[in-house]
């Protein structure tokens, strides 16, 4: 069915949502066209794809990953604790808000993570777009990552 959509020029390419690596491989094995993306939940509030192999799988395939809920359903904007403290510190350092730092964290990862933002507010979109101004170095990136993991990275 997905191949048919591409062959009939109804779509240029197809991807999937919430597939684990073995699901992508299983479906891909029965297709003639290439799956080009997988939309998964990944953020500083949903860190599992960094540790369970999902991002590594797509990075190896050179497939961009679409990140749904990249702001943790808003929890990263209103939450407290270690992640919020790191977001606030970096937001102050770069002169942006938490959302820009949270998105910059995803953009800095080499797996090519494409955040899917769920807002229609132009002001909110502008604040999120400030992620392009945030150039996290490795130390800053790992501070956020460790805060999200709740432990130091060896």
Outline where the language-model segments fall.
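Beta/alpha (TIM)-barrel catalytic core signal, keyed to glycine-rich beta->alpha loops juxtaposed to Asp/Glu
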Residues: 1-154
